[in-house]
Amino acid sequence: MSEPVEFLDLDDLVDMARILLGDPPPIRDIGLLGSAAARPQTTVGGRDAYPTMWSKAAALLQSVVDNHALVDGNKRLGWLATAVFLEINDASVAGATDDEVFDLVWAIASARSTIEEIAHHLEMMSGRRS
């Protein structure tokens, strides 16, 4: 049996935004930020919509980047939240290069990446293979 996944919540994202972007954080829509925090936990018919840790991380990253809950800093917060989510679940993308991060986050912001593609990139950045 695998370890339970530890999720970030809305308060975690607000705290990260405050640290990253200043106090008060530039929140445009708190509901959209809450939605982004909740998305990795989504279930459909009693099953996880995002069954792997990587797909959960991908859902978080895509939602924070694309929901535009902040006036500014959505991409930066998305990456930070994803890196923290993975760290608290015993994975790491700390070895990812700035170019890898930039390319992935911009592909998401440009609506060019699926959850599966994002999850794959995150897993490759971690050095893990499933």
Task: Report residues per predicted region.
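FIC/Doc superfamily catalytic core
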Residues: M1-S130
